[in-house]
Swiss-Prot record:
It comes from Tachypleus tridentatus (Japanese horseshoe crab). Transmembrane segments: none annotated. Belongs to the big defensin family. The keyword Disulfide bond applies. This is Big defensin.
Length: 117
């Protein structure tokens, strides 16, 4: 009878002891994943551009204010500013001699990037 109790205690110890080391290993893996987490990249169209307040807020939420400032992205007081490397202007409606540049309209927020024909 005493031998059976000893064997039962021995097997119980074998079952319970590894749980602590397994828990530590899982915590280490979670910390490793947290350290390896990378920030998303800023889309190339925005680097060095002047953007409206809504686009600025989106970029800050995406990558953070420090990364936005490091990418030389400037915030305009409104969506009415230059676009396409100073070759166009953000407007709500383009003039007759202009066309809407859909590629650069992303930096204009709710406006369109209007460029001369």
């Amino acid at each position: 009878m005493k031998g059976n109790i000893g064997i039962a205690v021995f097997y119980m110890l074998l079952l319970l002891l590894p749980t602590d080391s397994i828990g530590k290993k899982m915590e280490e893996e979670q910390e490793k994943l947290f350290r390896q987490k990378r920030n998303p990249l800023i889309p190339a169209i925005y680097i060095g551009a002047t953007v409206g307040p809504s686009v600025w807020a989106y970029l800050v939420a995406l990558v953070g204010a420090a990364a936005v400032t490091a990418a030389n992205i400037r915030r305009a007081s409104s969506d009415n500013h230059s676009c396409a490397g100073n070759r166009g202007w953000c407007r709500s409606k383009c003039f007759r001699h202009e066309y809407v540049d859909t590629y650069y309209s992303a930096v204009c927020g709710r406006y369109f990037c209007c460029r001369s024909r």
